[in-house]
Amino acid sequence: MISFIVIGRNEGQYLDSCFKSIRKAIYENNLIDSEIIYVDSNSTDNSIDIAIKNEIDKIYRLTEIWNAAIGRNIGAINARGDDLFFIDGDMELVSNFIPLVIDDNGNLKYDLVSGNLFQIFYNKHGRIQEEKLEFRERQNSYKKPITGGSFFIKKEIYKNIGGMDNRFWCSEDPELGLRLAKKGVLLQYLPATFIKHHTDVLKNPKVTDLKKGGWLYGNILMYKLNLFNKFTYKRMLFSDSSLIVLIFCIICFFWGLKWIMILYPITLLIRIKFKISKSGFQKYIYLLCRDILVAIMFIPFYKKPIPTANIKYQIIK
């Protein structure tokens, strides 16, 4: 049995399409033994009404504290299925992906699996500005130590790893991926579209990122909790190489090798591929500010996860 777990907060604009896409996948693939669970993060719009109208099997509303990690964990705890599928309320499931991951008996073929995303970007007027595949260059199947926000996973594996760490209000999915990878469970990526994602276009994503502090808090905590995980360093080399160089330079500075500090700005220049344009300069400043803040904020202690028993939620259905 598979449990489809939908999470959302104020996603009424897209939620009906999300539910209908899951219903379509269930019908077209004859997944009779399945259920749909919706966990709402105390929405102020009509999300709950939409879930009720769509006759969702189980509906829960988080009432005091909420984030994506908490929502997914509550859904998993209340799921009857041996296999779980997580999807956000602003996404749609592509029905023809199901036969690639579910066998004739309705069981998940892989321990952890996902596919490509078809991104649909909307401007401030609500009109589609751009549509594209997230990973156009990835044409082959492979394994990687990351999950993303939507994926299929065996419930036993999700339970044994402790689910998502609810301290994270962002970056909860890559952190889960690192812990799973350390246990030998890598995500199987299939080069087929499995999700349509509706999202807004950000005018200045780098500036917004720094202002909200989402990347800073999530990634710092992720790196700190997984400091002795070899997959952490592989991720850092791929996405945060300048941060590694900065840390190395700081260590050398205190050893008296001050001249090595020149390596850091050179690394930044390499990362932006020597662009002399305005966008290149903005990225240079962004990376500089981000890396310095990460290095500083790595030291503080962070609160412990909230015990599941202390999380309050209302059972709507």
Whereabouts are the PLM-identified features?
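Conserved donor NDP-sugar-binding/catalytic core segment of glycosyltransferases
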Residues: N96-R127
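A conserved acidic beta->alpha catalytic loop
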Residues: S21, Y38-I48, M91
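Short aromatic/hydrophobic "clamp" motif used to bind/position activated sugar donors
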Residues: L84
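Short, well-formed alpha-helical segments that are part of the catalytic scaffolds
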Residues: E11-I26
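Glycine-rich, basic loop-to-helix element that forms the pyrophosphate-binding segment
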Residues: L62-A79
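Acidic donor-binding loop at a coil-to-helix junction in glycosyltransferase catalytic cores
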Residues: C170-L178
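Catalytic core of nucleotide-sugar-dependent glycosyltransferases
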Residues: T193, P205-F231, L288-Y302
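Membrane-embedded multi-pass helical conduit in multi-pass membrane proteins
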Residues: I244-I306
